[in-house]
Structures are given as C-alpha cells and as structure tokens.
Curated annotation (Swiss-Prot):
Record EC number: 2.1.1.177
Domain of life, source organism: Bacteria
HAMAP family found in the cross-reference section: 23SrRNA_methyltr_H
Protein name per Swiss-Prot or TrEMBL: Ribosomal RNA large subunit methyltransferase H
Annotated localization: Cytoplasm
Function, in words: Specifically methylates the pseudouridine at position 1915 (m3Psi1915) in 23S rRNA.
Source organism of this protein record: Paraburkholderia xenovorans (strain LB400)
C-alpha cells in the first residue's frame, strides 16, 4: 500500500522539502509516502473562490490513484488522535487500496471533492500554512506506523 499526499501548491521552501523527505524516507517499503504537487489555479481579483477550487479539483482528480481510499484534509473533518490514525493503518493495509490524502489550495478543497472522499480528516484546529501540513502529515503517518510496530519513537 502506498500513502499518496496530493497537495495543491508548488515551489515550497527548502526546509519544507527537507522536513517532508526526512519522514518519508523513514517509512518502510510497504508504506511508502509519495508526494504529488498539484499546480494551483491562477487567482485574480473578481474570480470567485468556487471557480478556483473547481479548477483545482479537476487537477486533483486527474492525479488520484485508481481505487484509492480518499482522505480529504478539512477543518470540519474528524478530529483524530495519533492513536486513532495508528489504529486505522493496519485496517487500511488489509484493505489493500492505496490511501490518498488531499491538501487543498488557499481556498480549500472543492465541495464535490470533499463529498467524494471516504473521510474528512482535521489535522489541527489551528490554521496552518499548506506547506507545513505536508511535513506535519508525513510526521504523523510515520509516528502512527511506529506505534503499530512498538517502536520507541512515540512515547506516551
């Protein structure tokens, strides 16, 4: 099973790539994390956010792996703990489908895309920069995996 992170945005600072890569390389081969950057739609004054999100939705849908479980990151999503994420990983692996985590652009994810998702997940109650979410999600996926392996990275 692969864990795909589809994130709207590009040209991230070097420290974001370094942080993301650090956690991605720690994952075992059977749970590889792959980042796919989705080109953000050009914003202009007077253009409604709905139009921007719809254009980004088309790009995200084109990048989605076939038959993947879709987890859309959204501020109104389920507020899981790390332990809940760790509990989900083994069942997702048994399911056999890849998992695609979706990170929207500046306006968020298109409502049709969120409706299509298997799950809406809240990463934080805080407002975070999109770039930071990539690193945070990769770290939490690594931490969740270490919990399933009784690895000492996670301490309670």
């Amino acid at each position: 099973m692969k864990l795909h992170i589809l994130a709207v945005g590009h040209k991230m600072p070097d420290w974001i790539a370094t942080g993301f890569d650090e956690y991605a390389k720690r994952m075992p081969p059977e749970l590889r994390i792959e980042l796919r950057e989705i080109k953000p739609e050009q914003r202009s004054s007077g253009r409604p956010a709905e139009s921007v999100m719809a254009a980004e939705r088309i790009r995200i849908e084109a990048a989605l792996p076939k038959n993947a479980r879709i987890v859309a990151l959204d501020e109104r999503g389920k507020d899981w703990t790390t332990m809940q994420l760790a509990g989900a990983l083994p069942s997702w692996q048994q399911d056999g489908r890849d998992v695609a985590f979706l990170i929207g652009g500046a306006d968020g994810l298109d409502p049709d895309l969120k409706a299509r998702a298997d799950m809406l997940l809240r990463v934080s109650s805080l407002t975070l920069p999109h770039a930071m979410v990539r690193v945070l999600l990769a770290e939490q996926l690594y931490r969740a995996w270490t919990i399933t392996q009784n690895h000492p990275y996670h301490r309670v």
